[in-house]
């Protein structure tokens, strides 16, 4: 029998301690991983609701189990809000993750062995855009395009490769690209070779929802996103389309269920609905505008301190810092900043001489720090601290600088908590 006052603390102290330690880590560290954000207490409340108990195979009004009347309300609410948010005609809120959403799109539109053309992981793409270690590079014949020496997508390279390999599907989108993608140009190339255009907007979905980054829906056949990055919701996936082709919509439905997934996670869909409601509110646009302002402010500091920023700037929530000129590695920078309670991720940069697990750069993103209240002055100061640590790498004062920086980080984290009590 269950009781409402059951807790993890008195039942599983080892697990409870790990949860408490993670809570403290998040409060005392500055989070700059571009793919991470803080979910609101309302989102977490929905994730912990009784919907976690409900099996609901199928879709609203067409379930394989009884007792789904309230699950239907939740899912339809999430669908309708996502349609309004992005201007979509078709929405599927069931994918458990962005990768599963992408797998469903491939399964709906093309067959095993067909050719796809996507951005090279080393140039800012994603594993699921055709990387050889991913299902997308194993099941399908993947051809990769990249960026120029200036850090910009080479659309002529995309076009030439499309003409050469005649892909059935072109993937646009990224995990580490700081500029604006020309969705219309990508569709023009896709139409020229008779390919589908599939856009993965996971990293910039929040900016798109706020009207601060071009919406790919008018140009793409199908669009996917995660719901936890700039959107700031639960960890999950989403498929959208406005192509007007009912056959594609039907294929997408069946490719999610039953082809790739069984029962949807109704508690996560409820959390997605909460997230979409928040994204429709006026203050959401202000938040996303501040995300971009903060990223631009940090870029200027890094450049002033002599560090190269890939593509020389940013038009979204992230940017890459290259250490090739300094002879540093992303791995060393990641570790040193981590000791100072600043969390980033090492990242490959164009013409990177280092191995993928070492790299010559870091990726920096501002959704999380902006969510906890950092303004432009705060992030300029933060970028300066980061440069102090990077400047000291390998020098006698390295540990001293790291210790001093950590004290500054703890102070600002105390002033700007993630979840104020």
Curated annotation (Swiss-Prot):
InterPro entries for the chain: PyrdxlP-dep_Trfase, PyrdxlP-dep_Trfase_major, PyrdxlP-dep_Trfase_small, Ser_HO-MeTrfase, Ser_HO-MeTrfase-like, Ser_HO-MeTrfase_PLP_BS, SHMT-like_dom
Any one GO biological process: tetrahydrofolate interconversion
Pathway annotation: One-carbon metabolism; tetrahydrofolate interconversion; Amino-acid biosynthesis; glycine biosynthesis; glycine from L-serine: step 1/1
Enzyme class: transferase
Keyword terms: Amino-acid biosynthesis, Cytoplasm, One-carbon metabolism, Pyridoxal phosphate, Transferase
A molecular function (GO) term: glycine hydroxymethyltransferase activity
Catalysed reactions, semicolon-separated: (6R)-5,10-methylene-5,6,7,8-tetrahydrofolate + glycine + H2O = (6S)-5,6,7,8-tetrahydrofolate + L-serine
Co-factor(s): pyridoxal 5'-phosphate
GO cellular component term of the entry, any: cytosol
Subcellular location: Cytoplasm
Site label Plays an important role in substrate specificity, positions: 228
Positions bearing N6-(pyridoxal phosphate)lysine: 229
EC number: 2.1.2.1
DNA repair listed as a keyword: no
Domain of life: Bacteria
Binding-site residues for (6S)-5,6,7,8-tetrahydrofolate, renumbered to this chain: 121, 125-127
Protein family per UniProt: Belongs to the SHMT family.
Subunit details: Homodimer.
Function in brief: Catalyzes the reversible interconversion of serine and glycine with tetrahydrofolate (THF) serving as the one-carbon carrier. This reaction serves as the major source of one-carbon groups required for the biosynthesis of purines, thymidylate, methionine, and other important biomolecules. Also exhibits THF-independent aldolase activity toward beta-hydroxyamino acids, producing glycine and aldehydes, via a retro-aldol mechanism.
Protein known as: Serine hydroxymethyltransferase
Organism: Haemophilus influenzae (strain ATCC 51907 / DSM 11121 / KW20 / Rd)
Gene responsible for this protein: glyA
